[in-house]
């Protein structure tokens, strides 16, 4: 019997009240029950007759199709009263649940709803999933002893399966039990749209009420739409499990992070927190980049309400929250999307397109409609339900190119014979259009490591539509330069200046991310040449240079305290080093740089425009000195001068365009930053002496290994 094998796809045709020639037949399938009684609305009770080992029936003249009834069930271990799920026929959404990405996340999965039948409201959970190639799907959980025979789902249109189970509440654990097209049992699956989840070993999904949390960030959410390109954006990239641990070495919870991290971010002057992926992921060592529960914040650090509280508190402190989002691939764990209905439902079955060789994970099939809507719905979900301010899209290059990290015989060209993945390109454009149309104050950021054109260009101009792109070229070239011994830097001068050739081809974020301090690469401090003092001085110079360059800023946690060891997800940052001036000085410097960057429009308003930057000294390779000016929309300007050698440059002369004076705002060599404290003029007047093709010039005493910021004041 199909019910006995949990292989029935049309339970409403047999279970619940059914019309027949002798009246209404009420059938209930309840494996393990001893006896059963039905109670109708007026309180009358009627025993059901056992038809076979697990089935019960009542033949009645009463119309049970319109009224609500209860079942009183006797089990070997006790009594139970429930509303029969199979009396609620016709309460399922249509295939429209899969059509609109902005609505999908509120329709699919486990939704707490209240139905009205016969004038009586009945609360419970409506389960809805997508498995077009399955022959049967059941909901299993604690409520039915994880028995797939008890709650078979109804096959609906368009590949959907649904069932309303009354009386279930927030916090109910569940999974889906599926059979493939041949009737073979599949591994129990977590809900692809599940709002909450449990970690190893159960990997269960958990019913969660999205409306329960009471947000306090209305002022933040309703602030006027701003031009992000002209804002000071300074991101602190963070891995929640290894920023700080408690005294026992355990993770901080979301609420503990709110208490400890947010004041730190405010002190340090960061405008935004960028969280490495918080979507549920079974393998902690993946850092979140192998997600399975795309709609569920990881339970390692608390509940969904706890994560909402964390975001809420960030907003109340004036700090935006950006999430790393991973649409490039998904892991092969049995309880996830892999082989969900017995087929490659979410990935291309051909491994040349559907399997990532480096990461040993599946690649989404971006050409399939349900996959596209699933991913876009997920992007919108985080902005809607968790008030997230932006998405940093991971591994975009791997999506754009069919031959990404493949040999010539390991990929399939597109229909034009090329290597671009047109479906992925289309998906990213659609995602950006949806995000910016629904949430105009949000931002999307691409981690894209190639020269693909127009990543941050609007879609109506042929671009991908991202707000920003990480400048991987700047990161690579600048780190390559700063790792050279100072005496050799003159031979690599073009390496540090080259990124300015393309600095305005995209809306760039200058990123010093986690990727640069793992896998044997060492910490930023460890990359620097020289003795202990020179390492710190080089890093201070480099940080100053970064904050003076055009582009938004991103630092991975630990850079701001000159972490000496490379990052490990199994521990915490080296906070103990802050007892020493070398590290505490770096912390003070990064804080001052962030606040300077925010306070001076010249350092951020035209980050993405060539009108905001001019070289003053570009080609002095012999001394390894660079100088440029940054401009605000109102014409205010800041001069940034970097000396990349440990040799003080007394009376260094550089040309400037106008008469006036320059006032020192910040000097990375200052003693409070653990610098040498080499004397430097605090105010420098221009002189009528031509230099670098300009009529005016100034003479500066440049400290060794330093970056100096100076504000210009024009003479009346």
UniProtKB/Swiss-Prot annotation:
Taxonomic classification: Bacteria, Pseudomonadati, Pseudomonadota, Gammaproteobacteria, Vibrionales
Function in brief: Catalyzes the formation of the alpha-1,6-glucosidic linkages in glycogen by scission of a 1,4-alpha-linked oligosaccharide from growing alpha-1,4-glucan chains and the subsequent attachment of the oligosaccharide to the alpha-1,6 position.
Name of the featured protein: 1,4-alpha-glucan branching enzyme GlgB
The keyword Transferase is assigned to this record: yes
Top EC class for this record: transferase
GO CC entries: cytosol
Catalytic activity as recorded in UniProt: Transfers a segment of a (1->4)-alpha-D-glucan chain to a primary hydroxy group in a similar glucan chain
Organism per entry: Photobacterium profundum (strain SS9)
PANTHER family (UniProt xref): 1,4-ALPHA-GLUCAN-BRANCHING ENZYME
């Amino acid at each position: 019997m199909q019910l006995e094998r949990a292989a029935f796809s049309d339970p409403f045709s047999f279970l619940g009240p059914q019309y027949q020639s002798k009246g209404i037949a009420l059938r209930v399938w309840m494996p393990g029950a001893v006896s059963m009684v039905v109670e109708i609305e007026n309180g009358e009770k009627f025993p059901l007759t056992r038809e076979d080992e697990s089935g019960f029936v009542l033949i009645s003249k009463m119309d049970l199709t319109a009224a609500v009834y209860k079942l009183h069930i006797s089990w070997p271990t006790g009594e139970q009263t429930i509303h029969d799920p199979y009396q609620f026929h016709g309460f399922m959404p249509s295939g429209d649940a899969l059509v609109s990405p902005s609505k999908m996340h509120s329709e699919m999965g486990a939704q707490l709803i209240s139905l009205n039948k016969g004038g009586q409201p009945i609360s419970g959970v409506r389960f809805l999933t997508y498995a077009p190639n399955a022959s049967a799907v059941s909901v299993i959980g604690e409520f039915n002893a994880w028995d797939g025979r008890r709650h078979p789902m109804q096959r609906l249109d368009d590949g959907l399966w649904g069932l309303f189970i009354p009386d279930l509440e927030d916090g109910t654990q569940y999974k889906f039990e599926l059979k493939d097209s041949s009737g073979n049992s599949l591994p129990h699956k977590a809900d692809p749209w599940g709002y909450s989840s449990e970690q190893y070993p159960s990997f269960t999904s958990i019913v969660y009420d999205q409306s329960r949390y009471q947000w306090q960030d209305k002022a933040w959410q309703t602030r006027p739409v701003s031009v992000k390109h002209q804002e000071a954006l300074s991101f602190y990239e963070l891995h929640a499990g290894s920023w700080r641990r408690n005294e026992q070495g355990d993770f901080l919870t979301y609420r503990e992070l709110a208490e400890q991290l947010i004041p730190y971010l405010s002190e340090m002057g960061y405008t935004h927190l960028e969280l490495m992926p918080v979507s549920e992921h079974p393998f902690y060592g993946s850092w979140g980049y192998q997600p399975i529960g795309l709609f569920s914040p990881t339970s390692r650090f608390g509940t969904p309400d706890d994560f909402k509280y964390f975001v809420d508190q960030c907003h109340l402190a004036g700090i935006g929250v950006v999430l790393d989002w991973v649409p490039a691939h998904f892991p092969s764990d049995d309880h996830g999307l892999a082989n969900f209905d017995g087929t490659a439902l979410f990935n291309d079955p051909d491994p040349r397109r559907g399997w990532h060789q480096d990461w040993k994970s599946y690649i989404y099939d971006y050409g399939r409609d349900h996959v596209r809507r699933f991913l876009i719905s997920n992007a919108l979900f985080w902005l809607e339900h968790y008030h997230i301010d932006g998405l940093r899209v991971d591994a975009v290059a791997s999506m754009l190119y069919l031959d990404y990290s493949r040999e010539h015989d390991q990929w399939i060209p597109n229909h034009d014979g090329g290597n671009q993945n047109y479906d992925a390109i289309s998906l990213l454009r659609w995602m950006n259009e949806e995000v910016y149309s629904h949430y105009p104050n949000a931002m999307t950021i691409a981690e894209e490591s190639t020269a693909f054109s127009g990543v941050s260009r609007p879609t109506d101009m042929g671009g991908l539509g991202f707000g920003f792109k990480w400048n991987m070229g700047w990161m690579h070239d600048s780190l390559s330069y700063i790792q050279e011994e100072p005496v050799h830097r003159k031979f690599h001068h073009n390496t540090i200046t080259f990124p300015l050739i393309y600095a305005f081809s995209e809306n760039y974020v200058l990123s010093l991310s986690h990727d640069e301090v793992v896998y044997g690469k060492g910490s930023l401090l460890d990359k620097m040449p020289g003795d202990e003092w020179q390492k710190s001085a080089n890093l201070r110079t480099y940080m100053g240079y970064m904050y003076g360059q055009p582009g938004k800023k991103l630092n991975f946690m630990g850079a701001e305290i000159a972490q000496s060891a490379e990052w490990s997800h199994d521990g915490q940052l080296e906070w103990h080093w802050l007892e020493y001036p070398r590290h505490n000085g770096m912390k003070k410097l990064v804080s001052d740089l962030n606040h300077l960057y925010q306070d001076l429009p010249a350092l951020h308003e035209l980050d993405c425009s060539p009108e905001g930057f001019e070289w003053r000294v570009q080609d002095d390779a012999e001394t390894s000195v660079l100088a440029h000016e940054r401009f605000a929309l109102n014409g205010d300007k800041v001069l940034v001068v970097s000396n990349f050698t440990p040799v003080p440059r007394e009376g260094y002369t550089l040309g400037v365009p106008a008469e006036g004076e320059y006032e020192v705002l910040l000097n990375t060599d200052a003693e409070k930053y653990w610098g040498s404290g080499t004397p430097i003029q605090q105010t420098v007047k221009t002189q009528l002496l031509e230099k670098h093709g300009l009529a005016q010039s100034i003479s500066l005493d440049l400290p060794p290994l330093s970056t100096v910021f100076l504000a210009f004041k024009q003479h009346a």
